[in-house]
Every structure is written in C-alpha cells, then in structure tokens.
Amino acid sequence: KVAEYSVQKTYGKLLTLLEKAFNKKKPLFALPMYYPLAYSKVPVADGFAENRQKQVVGLIRILFLKRFESSARAFESSCQQLLRKVMAFVQVNSTTKHEQTAFERWRIHQEELLGEVQKRQNQLFDDGVEDDPEQDEDVIPEEMLEAAAVLDRELFDVPQILSESLQDLNQLAEFLNELRQFKPSQDDKLRALIKLLKTDPVLKKHKVMIFSEFMATARYLAVELEKAGIKGIDQIDSATKRSRSDVIRQFAPYYNGMTSKALADKDQPETRVLIATDVLSEGLNLQDAARLINYDLHWNPVRLMQRIGRVDRRMNPETEKKLIKDHPDVKAIRGTVEYWNFLPPGELDELLNLYKRVSNKTLLISRTLGIEGKKLLRPEDDFAALKDFDHQYEGEPTVLETMHLEYQRLLAAHPDLGARLEA
C-alpha cells in the first residue's frame, strides 16, 4: 500500500531552493575539499584516485537528496554537519590575510545562524544528558580542525578551492536559514503517518514496525509520535546505548523466547510501535508484528526486501499458539503481512529527476506501489529472483550495522556472553 504525502506542503520554499541548487553547473555543492584533484595545478597521474574523489562528491549529493526526502530533521542534521566540516577546511587553508578576512566576514555575517546551529546540533542528538556548561561553544569542534586537510599551494589552486568552498557555505546557510522556520506542524509526511497510525483499524491497536534509513528521522518520529499521543513507542538506531536484545524482546517477545507476562514480571514495558533504522533490517526475528511502514522513498529495493523479511518470515506453530492464546485479538491478522510505502506522487518526478542529475541513473518508481521498477511487491514477484539484482543497487549494511547484527547472533548463541562482557 502507498501512504501519500506532499513534499511541497512540508518544505514550501525550501523545495524550490533545492531544485535551484541542483540545477547549478556543479549540482547542489561543489565540495572541493572532497575533490581537490579537480583543482590540480599539475597533470593528475592517478586516474583511479581522481575518479574515487569524483564518486565521493556524487555520493554526498545523492545522500543529501535522500535525507531531504526522508525528513526535514535528517536534511538539517546533514547540512549542519557539512557546514562544520567545510568551515574547518576553509579555516585551516585560509593562510593569506585576504582569505582570512573573507572567512571572518562570512562568520560575522552568519553569526546568528551559527549560534542556532550549535543549539540545534545539541537538540538533534540529545540523549537526555544535560549540556555541559563548560562545553566549547565554537561551532567548529577542535577535532574537525585537526582532521581538515591542509592543501599544498604548489599542487592545488587553493584560492579557487576556497572561493567555491565559501559558495558551498552560502548554499548551506541558505538551506539552514529556511529550515529555522520549519515546524513539525507543517510536516505533511509526519501528519500522514500520524493519521495512518490513528485511523487504520489494525495499526491503531496492533504492533507495527516503522523503518527509516536515517537516525535523525527515526529520533524525530519517536518524539513527534509520542507528542501526538501514540502509545507504546520505542526507537532504536546504530547509536542506541540500551541493550539491543532488550529492545527487540520488548517488541517481539514471543519470537525471542519471552512472553508478555514475562516482560511484565521483569517490569519491562512491551513495545507496540518500534521505529528503527536498517540496523534491524536483517537477521532478526520480529514476527510478533505483522505490519510494517517504510517511511522513506525506496531508492534501493534490495534493502526493502530485507526490511519486509523481518516480519514476513516462517511462523513457528507453537509460538503462534502461545501468542494467540495470550492475545486472542491478534488471531485475525496472524498469517498475513501488510506494509505501507510513503510516496509523494505530486513531486515524485522532480525528485527522480534530481536523482538522475547527480547519479546518471534513472529510477522508475511505481506510483501505486512506491517501489522501483517491477521487481518487488506484486503478488507474482519472485523474491528469491530479486537477489540476482543485488549487485545493481547500493546500500549494503554498514560495517557498524554488520557488527551489531553479529553481536546479536553471538548473544543468542551464548546467553551468558553479555554478562561476561560487562563483568
């Protein structure tokens, strides 16, 4: 099923700014700090290195588009992070009086925004720990300054690199100033999700998984759904400090060796709505749920298949009997799996054109299914055959995600491992 929303209603002027930025000769950002070989004063002998730098820039542009579609919070956090990195790069490479003055003027002009960036950065990733009053208030962390590469002016056209980097900073500032006006109440995508969770006869009372590719989006949804009165919410991503096993068992106790009563006896609340990044999209048993929501547009059908596989798995007859005995109201939906894909039909062509502009790849995403091409999610599709297309798509699990998944497998095989590691 498709859950429709409007990008225009959510972003307003920001969508126009993004399209304008993508239509520049160097789409969105020039990013010379990641592609210095394009500004080499000497012939580039290592074509592989130059191509690698070029690909990095392309991937960053694609990532920004994906995060823009995901949520305003995900796009904002990326803009803030890149702003800080580019500022650090410009600061360490501005060695002439003219360059230092130009950068200082930019900082003074954007003083109000930079203060807001520091404040918002703390809010976006606040884990409930109070801010340290002694915390450095400089928007550029010391470690970023230390990590920024200092370019050899004999080899690279540093003045041109700095000029284009300042243009990138201006573009980021334009986005961030517009995002300062953003309020969750204008988020049409969020409103569509809240409506779905409150009005669908199954979703409003049974377990559901909500997947997003991005941590900032997942955390934003957890906060806003709770504000909207949705009960039984939990959220997990690659940086979650709580025990991942506990999070999984609280959402899917029956398929992870527990029951609702066992959770209650341990004074652990049972989760009804679990919001997760793709760290939970592979290798886990979450069949207590039979409904799944994919909050982001599907640029990668292979990862979509992995997500669906978390709830659409082989059922254990004994576990099913126990689950239905304890929760008779779920009997009608057991054995069926439904999933929703969020899709902006009115602006889909614009988003896909922007994607093609920076990736040179054409995606054909169905307006009725919300997925790419004709390779997935129709009754006649062959899920096993889809694996043959794996090499065509990006988005394999990150090293961190793979390590987390392997850790969970080890815990399942060796129940005492967690206690031994903590000892």
Features from the language model and the residues they span:
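Hydrophobic, Leu/Ile/Phe/Ala-enriched alpha-helical segments that form helix-helix packing faces
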Residues: 22, 197-200, 225, 251-255, ...
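Generic hydrophobic alpha-helical scaffold/packing signal
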Residues: 194, 305-308, 359
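A generic secondary-structure signal for well-formed alpha-helical elements
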Residues: 72, 76-79, 83-86, 90, ...
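Conserved RecA-like P-loop NTPase helicase motor core
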Residues: 226-347
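Helicase motor interdomain insertion/brace
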Residues: 1-242, 252, 270, 277-284, ...
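C-terminal accessory region of SF2 helicases/translocases
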Residues: 315-423
